[in-house]
């Protein structure tokens, strides 16, 4: 029997183990036992995953998830609050995804929780994309990010797994009630942690349940004091949650709560395991709140008074009570009492503490828990011990006192002889045993009794009291200024239970009370109209009256109404049409007037209808019985009475009512004489569900800047294309009236058709509105805020205002904000202070807001290319459901500080420089571009179209199977590029691995200028792994080469823009042709299969099948990953794939050839196609996708002038797109000064095209025709770009609107606050002069000149008058330090500048001085302090801050001084308005003065040669006042032009024709170091003696050596310092800049390689090339007394010349058509053009070139050089005193040099023979280039050796080569070899060079090369030693 019972117990244990709760992570045995005890015997089983940080809290989460799945198992629709992907995935398994929804937030903690979803989404295709979007914080149909109380998904059941914790702003009980009302939810099952400490508000550390909780008090005022609960895992507050303690405790305290939504909330605690609680939240229909009474004894708790707090009441950190386990506490008390009684000795405090520690553990006997773990904080143990000890002492004292009183009674009884003998004995025993000090006992006892009752065996918490019910909001004094702070903190609190909950019902009842009055008014109006003969209107009113007669309001409480509101022109009506376009029942639009009805009726289709207000009542009531409308839209609802909306609801009860209106426009007006006083719509607007619009597309920016508009709409944003519109007219000026003009006036009614007043054009728009205000009735009408609002917001183009009142009452009323009492009540400290604006009128045409910058930026803004966007963009993709709020991004998601300064133009915020490491923004861009629905065509339809497309491509492009040699060359070239990027051949082995197919998505650092109204997404790069791209790179290169060989097909990607322009222009001039430009960039919905199959068809000729399969697989499906998320992409294109350009070009060109008929030739590049031919027309029926393409996505330019990539095409000429170039220039941000300088060089190179008169004329004509502007505007842009490209770094502030980095100096804080700063600022405040009076600077000029007359001439400073009424900057005299005097700035000796004249800065504040960082390489002069106010620092997230102040400026239109002509004649003259403090204003006009550098005047007695020219002088117009005058006097420069030349360093001595510096002798150099004329040292300073260099001579020498790449042992004969000269780009060597000899150096990041001599690898800085002539022995050779130049060349690039060898500036860059960044030219795949890569050397200096291996190559002396312009004169400006020598250099892949003993002419021969075998090539005779020609009798070169290159990518031996001798005999030791099929140059190598000749010798080369390629196609390792280097 015993065995059987044991067996049964074993089986029972096994069954229980099988039925145990399975965890997914590992848990210890102790943790499982605690969980089993907590959940009352429930078995748990450990998992296999790694445990989480807080295991016990994780167990609670798993239990809650499993329990909630039981509730959603059989319901049709599931809504989860705070969803997890696991729960949603489980819900989707049993129902459609559309029936599952989750509401969450997108704050930081939620992003952290959802972060891993982006990486795990790929294994669940059903919800993977939605989960990835959730990780990025983007809403979808499955997940929303606005919270439970802001969503409308309908579901009767909802679940919440630990997601209802309040954070102070959401998830309170009232928020949950609001969410239940919106979602239609009746039941919510929720699990929460509700610790009992929420009732006691005491800190606790519970080790048994694994949590810790702390409470902190917040709130400054008594009415706002709250407690926040900090909840975390046990003793781990690193990841704690912060909740509102009072709201959190409300789930425990309340069982029923009234809500204002027509129902109450009932809260039922269904289960409670420790603190883990399950709630059931349901709707209730009975009112009244229910609270809970908690006896703490039932919870097993006891409150023990803290004796430390009693003895030290001022100890604030001490708690008043210690809440602990009652059973454990009583056990300790029993032990202490027993110990005292047994021993008779007092127990010590240490013994009590020790015993408490022994009771902390749990006691388990026979599997039964007898005592639980005692959860008590460490700091509470001693407090508890003290309290227990004190309690026992008090109890003993009480006992002793009782015995003492008994003794006294015994004694008195003994005296009376009434006690028996035994009692007498007891009395004697008491007397013997106890000696009690009665006074001491009394004091102790009284001290304890004075305290509160300190033992609460059954403490009752009454939730009705104020102390335990702080969830009821306390309302503070409303009119007190400080109380508003508390009121804001309480704005989301739960309303009081005593507050009336029927406010909405009362509002509707009040509206319905007017029904009878409204109906009677309609009856009277109907009779009146019938008597007047207007039968139609009378019938309409009678029908509306009948509907009103049937309307009753019994039982009507709240009516569900939507209210859409926003500023004028925000698109409310426009948004309603697409929103309700697909409804089956149709929409009824209600309009206030017939005019608006007719306008709406044009775009409404059946079954929707448009009616006026009264007719709509009859129509809605009539159709409600048959086919009711789904939605009724009441436009301009503010113009209706409130009862009208209720009537419409009763007329069609099933229809959804949406009201559109604006509370700040004109409301309901009663035109009858009855004065019915109907309630306005505003009384029910507060009870409607409101949707707000804050973007206006109609109102221009200057209207938004008006104080009256700012007050009414403080958050409004304008996307209007019109920047300025308000014009103020005088009486003498009038405006020509057109049919688009309206007159708003009373006295003009008889003269206007139709007559209108200010309120009548509401809801209408016109182009021009002429607004007169002069009569008394007009002023009375327009002084009302709502009427003014309507009058100012009806126009779209211009608003002319003429104020004919005597005192000018209208303009001040516009500049004054309206009274707050007129429309709403707001606390005092919330009022907005208007910006102070000083109005300056000129010629009666100036107004308060008509001010903007006149210059290149303004022209681009007028053309719509640049837009002021206020830094806000709306991000919305198709995945965002219509029921959710849009996600608004401010353009800069990361809130951290900038890591580097930014340089940009201040007027524009439409573009930004983004951080490529910004993970959040990268993920937003990723999902925004790829998370869109793709309606791709089927493969069957695609195959039909592919046949047509490929047939046309065969006719135009000679595609042929690739030859093995071509494949070998392309593959070797690709391998070389991969090796340069750090990859090797072994990487191909991981070709099919997950790592090899990984695609990383990064954000582009420089975003393009985009139109903000089109809401385009950002730009990113999809970086494919290089080992994946290597597979198809060779075949892509072959396809591109074959496309480039076609005569009729122009592949623009393989050549520069200039070459493409020349070819297209020549083709068009052959004969008259039609031409069209097509862009298919946005055509990405149906062409996926077509483009894939077209590219696969081309690759099928020679490409292996597995590579084609790989391409199709990657094109159809792939995963793009960013750092914090990934997106699965299907079919859409990637910008980073190696095949993107070729694939797009093939598809676009083939598609156009198949669709168009009559094409003669075609040019294509990517998505852009240019077609030309006779009778061009589109035949869409030729392709199945043609009709859809032509109707929707194809952008065809059919005008006479079209744009194609970066230029403009017309029949006359093909020119550059100046507007496009200017947009990229002025809309670009620059991250550092170096990039800015390189970009300027690129712009200067582009501007060379504009120097030809014909090219300039045709460019102006083409651009003006294309963009619809004038030629003057285009000429102005060309001049501005030319000036931009030639401005020095030190003169950047002369560019239009440019902002440069500034460095604020230290300044005392008293400048900004305190009396000192105010007094100092008051001294600088100066009054503006009246017209004709001298201003403060003129007065200063006079005083300065008067004082200067008393000083010496050398210290005098002449102030030159300026045409704008101010003073020019001083003209410096020799020997006088330079001083800057700028506009509005007064420099002081203490480093501060006063008298600021900057917009956005308070004039009372002084500003610190600034020191501008000069150009790199120039040492800053410490005595030269620049206090220019024209420059400020730009950052990405706080880009509008003015340095040195706390103010921000939205825009700052700085002066335009670098242009060659005034922009005012080409644009309309602007109005001068000076804003002193404006945070969000428009542009100000800073053109008056302040930015002019001083003129370099030739002094008397100096020859012209004394001022050497470093560049051509330019005539620059300096903008002055419009009348070109100064103080009413005409200046000598009356034309507004002065001659400005470039500033020279002050330490250059002026000689005759050259700039010379003194020589300095360096220690240890062995000779003098001569600095050539006009050159600088590496520090940027002239080469003076050592005393001129404070850093010392040795430091300069070391830096000099580092920059020249010269070792310590190389300091000797003539060194040439390398110069980085991106300006040449292989175009013109003469433009190398200032310097005697410039050697273009290689990349600065030169890698360290092994060679014989040590190299110094310091980065070369940009500077002028210097030649150092020395006489010294080196490497054991004596230099025969002549100077020489040594050049080190980097082997990685294999070239001598500029960085851009093979990549000219005029070639296209990777950024579409953007000017190339000269310093970042990395495109080495383009074949080298002729005549590029020149080596310069001085006259008469032999040059020797040494490679990395130490081989010295003598090139001989370089003399007698000519170029295409003839012999250079000695006084050349660019190379003064020197000639230049050009060495033709071809690019190859390795720079190994050898000696050639035979006589060879200098240069590299062109070996392009395609013949095979041993056919000899011609002799090497001469190098013939356009830059220089060298004959056979070149003197000293004949006896020297020339460098001949050996390329590393040798493919095949062509045959022997002959030398340049007389007999032309072949040299058997020399072999001609070619690389890349002869594209990049050829070379020779010697047979004795064993490293090269072993593998590639004569007959072996061809066989080994072919064998190597075949082996490589099977396995990379099989090539063995024959693998290419």
UniProtKB/Swiss-Prot annotation:
Name of the protein: Methyltransferase/helicase/RNA-directed RNA polymerase
Residue ranges with Basic and acidic residues bias: 1319-1329, 1355-1427, 1482-1527, 1540-1552, 1578-1591, 1672-1682
Any single Pfam family the record assigns to this protein: Vmethyltransf
Protein family per UniProt: Belongs to the ssRNA positive-strand viruses RNA-directed RNA polymerase family.
InterPro entries linked: (+)RNA_virus_helicase_core_dom, Alphavirus-like_MT_dom, DNA/RNA_pol_sf, P-loop_NTPase, RNA-dep_RNA_pol_alsuvir
GO-annotated molecular function: ATP binding; ATP hydrolysis activity; mRNA methyltransferase activity; RNA binding; RNA helicase activity; RNA-directed RNA polymerase activity
EC number of this enzyme: 2.1.1.-, 2.7.7.48, 3.6.4.13
Record key words, sorted: ATP-binding, Helicase, Hydrolase, Nucleotide-binding, Nucleotidyltransferase, RNA-directed RNA polymerase, Transferase
């Amino acid at each position: 029997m015993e065995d059987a019972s044991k067996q049964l117990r074993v089986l029972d244990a096994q069954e229980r183990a099988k039925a145990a709760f399975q965890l997914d992570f590992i848990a210890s045995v102790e943790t499982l036992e605690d969980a089993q005890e907590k959940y009352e015997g429930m078995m748990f089983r450990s998992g296999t995953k790694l445990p989480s940080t807080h295991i016990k809290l994780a167990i609670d989460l798993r239990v809650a998830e499993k329990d909630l799945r039981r509730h959603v198992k059989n319901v049709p629709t599931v809504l989860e609050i705070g969803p997890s992907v696991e729960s949603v995935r489980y819900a989707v398994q049993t129902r459609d995804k559309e029936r599952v929804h989750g509401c969450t937030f997108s704050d930081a903690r939620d992003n952290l929780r959802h972060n891993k979803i982006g990486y795990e989404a790929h294994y669940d295709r059903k919800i993977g994309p939605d989960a990835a979007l959730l990780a990025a914080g983007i809403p979808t149909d499955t997940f929303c990010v606005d919270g439970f109380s802001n969503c409308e998904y309908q579901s009767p059941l909802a679940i919440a797994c630990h997601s209802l914790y309040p954070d102070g702003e959401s998830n309170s009980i009232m928020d949950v009630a609001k969410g239940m009302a919106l979602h239609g939810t009746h039941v919510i099952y929720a699990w929460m942690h509700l610790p009992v400490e929420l009732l006691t508000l005491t800190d606790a550390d519970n080790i048994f349940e694994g949590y810790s909780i702390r409470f902190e008090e917040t709130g400054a005022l008594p009415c706002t004091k709250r407690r926040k609960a900090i909840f975390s895992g046990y003793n781990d507050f690193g990841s704690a949650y912060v909740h509102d303690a009072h709201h959190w405790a409300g789930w425990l305290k309340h069982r029923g709560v009234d809500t204002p939504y027509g129902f109450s909330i009932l809260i039922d605690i269904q289960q409670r395991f420790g603190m883990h609680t399950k709630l059931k939240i349901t709707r209730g229909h009975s009112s009244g709140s229910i609270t809970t009474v908690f006896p703490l004894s039932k919870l097993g708790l006891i409150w023990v008074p803290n004796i430390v707090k009693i003895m030290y009441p001022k100890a604030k950190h001490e708690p008043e009570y210690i809440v602990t386990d009652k059973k454990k506490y009583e056990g300790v008390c029993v032990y202490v009492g027993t110990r005292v009684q047994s021993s008779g000795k007092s127990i010590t405090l240490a013994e009590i503490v020790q015993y408490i520690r022994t009771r902390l553990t749990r006691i388990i006997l026979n599997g039964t828990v007898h005592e639980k773990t005692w959860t008590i904080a460490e700091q509470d143990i001693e407090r508890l011990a003290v309290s227990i000890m004190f309690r026992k002492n008090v109890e003993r004292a009480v006992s002793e006192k009782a015995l003492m009183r008994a003794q006294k009674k015994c004694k008195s009884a003994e005296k009376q002889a009434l006690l028996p003998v035994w009692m007498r004995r007891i009395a004697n025993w008491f007397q013997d045993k106890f000696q009690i000090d009665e006074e001491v006992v009394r004091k102790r006892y009284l001290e304890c009794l004075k305290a509160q009752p300190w033992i609460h065996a059954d403490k009752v918490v009454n939730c009705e009291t104020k102390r335990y019910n702080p969830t009821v909001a306390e309302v503070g004094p409303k009119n007190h200024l400080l109380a508003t702070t508390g009121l804001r903190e309480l704005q989301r609190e739960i309303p009081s239970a005593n507050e009336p909950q029927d406010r909405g019902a009362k509002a509707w009842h009040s509206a319905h009370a007017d029904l009878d009055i409204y109906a009677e008014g309609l009856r009277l109006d109907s009779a009146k109209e019938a008597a007047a003969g207007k039968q139609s209107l009378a019938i309409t009113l009678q029908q509306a009256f009948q509907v009103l007669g049937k309307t009753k309001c019994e039982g009507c409480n709240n009516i569900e109404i939507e209210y859409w509101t926003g500023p004028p022109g925000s698109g409310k009506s426009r948004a309603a049409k697409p929103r309700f376009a697909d409804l089956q029942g149709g929409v009824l639009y209600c309009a206030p007037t017939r005019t608006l009805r007719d306008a709406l009726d044009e775009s409404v289709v059946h079954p929707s209808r448009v009616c006026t207000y009264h007719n709509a009542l009859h129509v809605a009531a009539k159709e409600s019985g048959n086919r009711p409308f789904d939605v009724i839209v009441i436009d301009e609802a503010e113009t209706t009475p409130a009862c009208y909306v209720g009537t419409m609801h009763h007329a069609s009860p099933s229809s959804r009512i949406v009201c559109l209106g604006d509370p700040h426009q004109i409301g309901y007006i009663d035109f009858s004489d009855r004065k019915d006083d109907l309630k306005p719509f505003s009384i029910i607007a507060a009870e409607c569900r409101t949707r707000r619009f804050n973007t206006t597309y109609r109102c221009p920016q200057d209207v938004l800047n008006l104080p009256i508009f700012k007050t009414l709409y403080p958050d409004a944003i304008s996307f209007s294309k019109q920047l300025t519109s308000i014009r103020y007219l005088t009486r003498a000026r009038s405006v020509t009236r057109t049919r688009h003009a309206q007159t708003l006036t009373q006295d003009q009614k008889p003269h206007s058709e139709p007559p209108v007043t200010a309120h009548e054009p509401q809801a209408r728009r016109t182009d021009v509105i002429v607004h007169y205000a002069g009569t008394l009735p007009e002023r009375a009408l327009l002084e009302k805020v709502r009427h003014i609002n309507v009058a100012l917001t009806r126009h779209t183009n211009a608003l002319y205002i003429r104020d004919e009142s005597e005192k000018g009452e209208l303009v001040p009323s516009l500049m004054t904000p309206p009274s707050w009492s007129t429309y709403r009540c707001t606390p005092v400290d919330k009022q907005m202070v208007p910006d102070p604006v000083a109005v300056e009128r000129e010629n009666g045409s100036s107004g308060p807001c008509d001010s903007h910058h006149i210059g290149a930026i303004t022209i681009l803004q007028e053309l719509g290319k640049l837009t002021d966007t206020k830094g806000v963009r709306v991000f919305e993709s198709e995945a965002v459901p219509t029921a959710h709020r849009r996600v608004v991004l401010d353009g800069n998601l990361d809130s951290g500080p900038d890591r580097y300064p930014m340089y940009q133009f201040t007027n524009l915020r439409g573009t930004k420089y983004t951080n490529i490491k910004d993970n959040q923004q990268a993920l937003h861009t990723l999902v925004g571009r790829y998370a869109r629905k793709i309606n791709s065509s089927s493969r069957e339809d695609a195959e039909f179209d592919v046949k047509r497309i490929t047939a046309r491509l065969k006719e135009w492009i000679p595609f042929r199977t690739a030859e093995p040699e071509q494949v070998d060359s392309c593959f070797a070239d690709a391998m070389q590029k991969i090796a340069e990027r750090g990859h090797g051949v072994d990487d191909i082995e991981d070709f099919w691995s997950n790592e090899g197919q990984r695609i990383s998505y990064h954000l582009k650092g420089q975003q393009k200028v985009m139109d903000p109204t089109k809401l385009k997404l950002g730009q990113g790069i999809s970086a494919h792994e290089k080992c994946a791209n290597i597979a198809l790179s060779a075949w892509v290169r072959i396809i591109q080469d074959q496309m480039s060989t076609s005569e009729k097909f122009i592949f623009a990607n393989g050549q520069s823009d200039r070459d493409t322009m020349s070819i297209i222009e020549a083709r068009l001039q052959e004969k008259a042709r039609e031409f069209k430009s097509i862009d298919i960039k946005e055509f990405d919905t149906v062409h996926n299969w077509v483009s894939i199959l077209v590219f696969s068809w081309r690759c099928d000729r020679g490409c292996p099948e597995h590579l084609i399969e790989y391409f199709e697989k990657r094109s159809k499906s792939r995963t793009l990953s960013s750092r914090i998320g990934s997106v699965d992409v299907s079919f859409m294109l990637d910008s980073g794939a190696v095949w993107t350009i070729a694939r797009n070009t093939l598809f676009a060109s083939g598609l156009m050839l198949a669709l168009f008929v009559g094409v003669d030739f075609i040019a294509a590049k990517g998505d852009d196609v240019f077609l030309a031919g006779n009778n061009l027309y589109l035949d869409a029926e030729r392709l199945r996708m043609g009709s859809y393409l032509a109707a929707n996505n194809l952008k065809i330019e059919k005008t006479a002038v079209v744009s194609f990539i970066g230029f403009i095409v017309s029949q006359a000429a093909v020119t550059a797109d100046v507007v496009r170039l200017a947009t990229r220039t002025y809309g670009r941000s620059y991250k550092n000064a170096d990039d800015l300088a390189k970009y300027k060089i690129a712009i200067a190179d582009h501007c060379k095209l504009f120097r030809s008169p014909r090219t300039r004329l045709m460019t102006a004509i083409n651009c003006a025709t294309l963009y619809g502007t004038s030629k003057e505007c285009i000429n102005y842009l060309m001049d501005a770009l030319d000036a931009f490209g030639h401005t020095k770094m030190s003169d950047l502030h002369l560019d239009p609107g440019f902002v440069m980095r500034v460095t604020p100096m230290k300044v005392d804080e008293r400048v900004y606050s305190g009396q000192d700063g105010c007094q100092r600022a008051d001294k600088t405040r100066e009054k503006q002069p009246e017209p004709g009076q001298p201003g403060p600077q003129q007065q200063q000029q006079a005083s300065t000149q008067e004082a200067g007359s008393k000083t010496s001439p050398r210290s005098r400073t002449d102030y030159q008058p300026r045409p704008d009424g101010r003073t020019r900057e001083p003209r410096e005299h020799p020997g006088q330090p330079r001083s800057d005097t700028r506009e509005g700035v007064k420099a002081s000796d203490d480093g501060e500048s006063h008298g600021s004249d900057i917009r956005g800065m308070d004039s009372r504040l002084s500003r610190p001085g600034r020191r501008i960082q000069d150009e790199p390489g120039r040492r800053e002069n410490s005595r030269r302090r620049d206090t220019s106010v024209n420059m400020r620092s730009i950052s990405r997230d706080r880009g509008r801050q003015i340095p040195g102040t706390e103010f921000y400026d939205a825009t700052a239109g700085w002066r335009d001084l670098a242009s060659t002509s005034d922009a005012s004649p080409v644009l309309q003259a602007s109005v001068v308005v000076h804003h002193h403090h404006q945070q969000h204003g428009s542009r100000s006009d800073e053109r008056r003065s302040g930015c002019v550098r001083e003129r370099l005047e030739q002094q008397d007695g100096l020859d012209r040669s004394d001022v050497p020219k470093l560049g051509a002088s330019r005539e620059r117009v300096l903008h002055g006042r419009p009348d070109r005058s100064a103080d009413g006097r005409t200046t000598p420069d009356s034309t507004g032009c002065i001659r400005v030349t470039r500033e020279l360093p002050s330490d250059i001595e002026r000689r005759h024709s050259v700039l010379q510096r003194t020589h300095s002798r360096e220690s240890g150099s062995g000779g003098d170091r001569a600095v050539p004329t006009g050159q600088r040292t590496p520090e940027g300073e002239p080469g003076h003696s050592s005393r001129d260099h404070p850093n010392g001579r040795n430091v300069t020498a070391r830096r000099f050596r580092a920059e020249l790449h010269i070792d310590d042992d190389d300091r000797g004969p003539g060194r040439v310092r390398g110069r980085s000269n991106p300006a040449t780009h292989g175009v013109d060597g003469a433009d190398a800049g200032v310097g005697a000899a410039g050697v273009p150096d290689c990349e600065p990041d030169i890698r360290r390689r092994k060679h014989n001599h040590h190299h110094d690898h310091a980065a070369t800085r940009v500077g002028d090339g210097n030649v150092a002539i020395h006489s010294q022995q080196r490497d054991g050779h004596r230099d025969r007394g002549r100077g020489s130049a040594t050049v080190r060349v980097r082997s990685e690039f294999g070239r001598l010349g500029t960085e851009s060898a093979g990549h000219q500036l005029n070639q296209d860059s990777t950024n579409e058509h953007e000017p190339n960044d000269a310093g970042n030219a990395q495109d080495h795949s383009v074949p080298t053009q002729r005549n590029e890569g020149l080596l310069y050397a001085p006259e008469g200096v032999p040059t020797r070139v040494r490679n990395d291996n130490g081989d010295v190559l003598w090139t001989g002396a370089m003399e007698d050089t000519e170029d295409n312009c003839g012999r250079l004169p000695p006084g050349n400006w660019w190379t003064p005193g020197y000639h230049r020598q050009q060495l033709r250099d071809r690019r190859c892949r390795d720079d190994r040099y050898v000696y050639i003993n035979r006589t060879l002419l200098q240069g590299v021969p062109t070996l392009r023979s395609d013949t095979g075998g041993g056919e000899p090539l011609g002799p090497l005779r001469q190098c013939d280039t356009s830059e220089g020609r060298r004959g056979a009798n070149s003197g000293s070169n004949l006896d020297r050796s020339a460098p001949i290159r050996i390329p590393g990518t040798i493919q095949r031996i062509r045959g022997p080569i002959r030398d340049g001798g007389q007999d032309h005999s072949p040299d058997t030791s020399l072999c001609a070899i070619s690389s890349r099929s002869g594209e990049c140059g050829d070379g020779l190598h010697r047979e004795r060079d064993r490293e090269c000749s072993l593998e590639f010798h004569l007959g072996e080369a061809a066989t080994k090369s072919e064998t190597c390629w075949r082996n490589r196609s099977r396995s990379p390792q099989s090539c063995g030693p024959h693998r290419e280097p």
